[in-house]
UniProtKB/Swiss-Prot annotation:
Family the entry assigns: Belongs to the peptidase C19 family. USP20/USP33 subfamily.
Domain (USP): residue spans on this chain: 144-684
Region entry Disordered, spans: 256-414
Active site positions: C153 (nucleophile), H642 (proton acceptor)
Entry protein name: Ubiquitin carboxyl-terminal hydrolase 20
Composition skew (Basic and acidic residues), residue ranges: 258-278, 315-331
Taxon lineage: Eukaryota, Metazoa, Chordata, Craniata, Vertebrata
Residues bound to Zn(2+) 3: C43, C48, H64, H70
Length: 913
């Protein structure tokens, strides 16, 4: 449908058409037979006012078109166009939108034309209200179903829930130029196309997500076939792949920013507290040497109130965010992924953690994602807090059968919080890796990533180990009656429980199920609450997840200081809140012989979910309340069932049920009574809306300025959708030297927009960050480095091919060297240009085995490759490392006349490098 709009050559015959004219004609009658609407057709030929009836009557519109040779006509009910000559549907939306385009780009009129082909700044002005009112007359966007491809309801429900997360959807709609990848299967492109179809003004009733379904099956074979899968597993796999395809390295620009800001001391004093405590400096006093600025930095600590948020709305004809401004929807700043860190707590120092609060810090950029589904870096020490009793971090590994509806949650007993004191934290360095670890970020990590501080204390020596772990979702246990009683007595004895309903959601599984469900609800409503037990709320599940655990018995803590198993205690708190909080309720249990589903109703708030009780004192997030965006529900048993999603439309604020290709409006009470499985919450902030309106007012002033400022388009998208967008991050289109990386220059217009001086100064004073950019140029330093890197790669790969060719031609080599294939694959990716980072020193430790005599031999079954001595010498001279593992071949001399043929002996020896 999208391709046909450029193929019709008859659009030039259309006269001046406005929507008001079409609406006026729709209230008339057929000029031939006098019949009234609906489904009248208006001729679009220049100076032709004819209105005729359609095929449901005498079809005078077709007769008129054939007689007069007027090819184009428009349906006055649906506003769809038909070309009789092309015999297909065409589109008029570009002509209808023409009056709107001039009002949305004021910078083209008031600023000199740019020398570089950059897009105008997407700032709304006062007269955009008219375009919004015209948009409101159209059908709400986003209400598009998805066809079931065969037990694919788990995918459809997950995609609908993600589609109704405005920060993510707005990125794919407004920042399409940033969706670039050379990684297969290019799932981000398929998702972008799907989102564009779902949110198009001329949306179909449903779409068929074939391309995305095919791509996810290539990524994870578990989703191949037509078996029912877990929607949570699909969400993780999809977002992992989107991150991998869209991730970009974080540019270390501390020195650059300091150099640019050194001449503005007054501004520096105003924003002295702009940098929020990072996890590096929160855990360390001397970790600033290897830190770069990232999205996560920046808080207005210089003022008494929290840092305010601003909005620059995008073009009114496309932006979802303008609708959000009218409805006062609230958003927040999704902070970034960080590595796990270990903290050692000495028993002979202070007995509180107050010292942690006083650590000066600056924000830390996100770290690389793990390739595992949970995407949490594995700690190298005992500070990893995932035990068999209850995971104290958001990491949980699914082990259920692939054909079941969900994966099994681990047993989650809720324990009383023991009384104990924590010691002052001191950092243990994680140990330098041989290869420099590159930090990455993406729109996925910006929106969905939060972090948790997990601590384990030895009750004998009081040593405390801490781990900072990144989470994408929180998998919460559903507490039973006994656990709920302990929680309420120990934690919520002074906090009244929020009211909620006890009824489960209506499961559309036939009349029998409906009747049974109706009777059950009636019985529940007539029975005292003490009979069924207390209402389980989402806050109870959060309290159960964050409750302290005692480590004793079979689950004792291995203390590094005591060198023994000791009784301990562990707990966790949220260190950084995400923009979108994804909550997964553990409704499925898979035991050895059977599986079952927990059908307990969990009451969850539609607005005002407050996470303050679960925050660490060192939490950097200012906004702690969330509003519900969408909820995925599962109807059925552990072995089979059906997924649907309830989502709030961001344009009109109404709730809708998405059941494959069927979309139905529902009341919010239906959502409250739903049996939630996966919930998406979004930060709320009224202050953000007011600040956005202030920026719109500044933009409408149209003050003439001599300087134009370039700002990151991606950061402006955060303005549109985040409550806490953080400091301006122009590093996303700059290199570490302050110029444009050569590989980005050809699409720089997709990365930046132009701001007038008054808007830039306001944003810069409020949010900090930067750096200020008035001129775009290709970085000559990066160009030289790229050329040198290309030359190095070419020399290394040519030399290897030459040496390996000679090795293959050698019939009986006297010595063969072994090299780890893991390291070799990293080197191969580097020389082929797939990875910009060199592999680091050769690491043969994985394929080496130490014998009792101290000699190192080749490990049996090791993943290794064979190279010549010359090749080993060449690679070792470039990268170093080891140990050296050589397989020597020698022919033994015959010991007697019976030994006629000589015996070949293969001796593996290793020489430490």
């Amino acid at each position: 449908m999208g391709d046909s709009r450029d193929l019709c050559p008859h659009l030039d015959s259309i006269g001046e058409v406005t929507k008001e004219d079409l609406l006026l004609k729709s209230m008339g009658t057929c000029q031939s037979c006098g019949v009234t609407g609906p489904n009248l057709w208006a001729c679009l030929q220049v100076a032709c006012p004819y209105v005729g009836c359609g095929e449901s009557f005498a079809d005078h519109s077709t007769i008129h078109a054939q007689a007069k040779k007027h090819n184009l006509t428009v349906n006055l009910t649906t506003f769809r166009l038909w070309c009789y000559a092309c015999e297909k549907e065409v589109f008029l939306e570009q002509r209808l939108a023409a009056p709107l385009l001039g009002s949305s780009k004021f910078s083209e009129q008031d600023s000199p034309p740019p020398s570089h082909p950059l897009k105008a700044v997407p700032i709304a002005v006062a007269d955009e209200g008219e375009s919004e009112s015209e948009d409101d007359d159209l059908k709400p966007r986003g209400l598009t179903g998805m066809k079931n491809l065969g037990n694919s309801c788990y995918m459809n429900a997950a995609l609908q829930a993600l589609s109704n997360c405005p920060p993510l959807t707005q990125f794919f709609l407004e920042c399409g130029g940033l969706v670039r990848t050379d990684k297969k299967p290019a799932l981000c492109k398929s998702y972008q196309k799907l989102v564009s179809e779902v949110w198009h003004k001329k949306r179909p009733s449903y779409v068929v997500p074939t391309s995305l379904s095919h791509g996810i099956k290539l990524v994870n074979p578990m989703f191949r076939g037509y078996a029912q899968q877990d929607t949570q597993e699909f969400l993780r796999c999809l977002m992992d792949q989107l991150h991998e395809e869209l991730k970009e390295p974080v540019v270390a620009t501390v020195a650059l920013t300091e150099a640019r800001d050194s001449d503005s001391s007054d501004t520096d004093e105003k924003r002295e507290g702009d940098r929020s405590p990072s996890e590096d400096e929160f855990l360390s006093c001397d970790s600033s040497s290897d830190r770069g600025e990232g999205d996560g930095q920046g808080r207005g600590g210089g003022s008494s109130q929290a840092e305010t948020e601003l909005l620059i709305p995008d073009e009114a004809s496309r932006a979802i965010s303008e609708k959000e401004r009218m409805k006062d929807r609230k958003f927040s700043w999704g902070q970034q992924r960080t590595n796990s860190e270990q903290v050692d707590e000495d028993a002979d120092v202070d007995t509180t953690m107050a010292a942690l609060d006083d650590q000066p810090a600056e924000a830390q950029p996100p770290s690389p994602r793990s390739s595992s589904p949970c995407r949490t870096p594995e700690p190298d020490n005992d500070a990893h807090l995932c035990s068999s009793s209850r995971p104290c971090s958001p990491v949980h590994h699914h082990e259920g059968h692939a054909k079941l509806s969900s994966s099994p949650p681990r047993a989650s007993p809720v324990r009383m919080a023991p009384s104990y004191v924590l010691k002052k934290a001191q950092v243990l360095s994680a140990g330098s890796r041989r290869r420099k670890e590159q930090r990455y970020r993406s729109v996925i990590s910006d929106i969905f990533d939060g972090s948790i501080l997990s601590l384990v204390q030895c009750l004998t020596c009081d040593r405390v180990s801490a781990t900072v772990e990144t989470f994408q979702d929180l998998s919460l246990p559903i507490p039973g009656k006994e656990d709920l009683a302990k929680l309420h007595s120990a934690i919520y004895q002074n906090v009244p429980a929020k009211p909620g309903t006890c009824g489960d959601s209506y499961a559309a599984q036939g009349w029998l199920a409906f009747i049974v469900e109706y009777i059950r609800r009636f019985v529940v409503s007539c029975t005292p609450s003490w009979f069924w037990g207390p209402v389980v709320t989402l806050e109870d599940c959060l309290a159960a997840f964050f409750a302290a655990d005692e480590l004793k018995g079979d689950n004792m803590y291995s203390c590094e200081r005591c060198k023994k198993l000791r009784n301990g205690v562990k707990y966790c708190k949220v260190l950084r809140l995400p923009e979108i909080l994804c909550i997964h309720l553990k409704r499925f249990r898979h035991e050895v012989m059977y599986s079952f589903k927990i059908n307990s109703h969990v009451s969850f708030p539609l607005e005002g979910l407050d996470l303050r009780p679960f925050l660490a004192k060192e939490c950097t997030s200012q906004i702690t309340t969330y509003d519900l965006l969408s909820v995925i529900c599962h109807h059925g048993t552990a072995g089979s069932g059906h997924y649907i999603a309830y989502c709030q439309n961001v344009i009109n604020g109404q709730w809708y049920e998405f059941d494959d290709q069927y979309v139905t409006e529902v009341h919010e009470t239906v959502v409250q009574n739903a049996e939630g499985y996966v919930l998406f919450y979004r930060k709320s902030s009224e202050e953000a809306v007011r600040e956005r309106q202030q920026v719109v007012s500044l933009a409408a002033m149209r003050e003439p300025s001599l300087l134009r400022f370039y700002v990151s388009r991606e950061w402006l998208n955060k303005f549109n959708t985040f409550a806490e967008p953080g400091p301006i991050t122009n590093q996303t289109f700059l290199c570490s030297h302050g110029g444009i990386p050569p590989h980005k220059y050809h699409y720089i217009d997709d990365l930046v927009v132009i701001l007038p001086q008054n808007v830039w100064e306001h944003l810069y004073n409020r949010f900090g960050g930067g750096p200020a950019v008035n001129h775009l140029y290709v970085c000559s330093i990066c160009q030289v480095e790229i050329e040198a890197l290309a030359k190095r790669r070419r020399i290394e790969i040519d030399t290897f091919i030459k040496l390996n060719k000679a090795f293959q031609a050698e019939e009986s080599p006297g010595i063969i060297y072994c090299i780890s294939m893991q390291w070799f694959r990293e080197w191969e990716a580097f020389v082929k240009g797939k990875d910009n980072e060199p592999p680091g020193p050769i690491d043969n430790s994985r394929i080496a085995q130490v014998k009792g005599s101290g000699h190192v031999q080749l490990k049996q079954g090791a993943d290794y490759g064979q190279i010549s001595e010359e090749t080993w010498t060449y690679l070792n001279s470039l990268y170093g490392g080891g140990p050296e593992i050589a397989i020597r071949q020698s022919v033994a001399q015959p010991l007697g006349p019976e030994s006629l043929h000589g015996e070949q002996k293969i001796e593996a020896e290793a020489r430490a490098v």
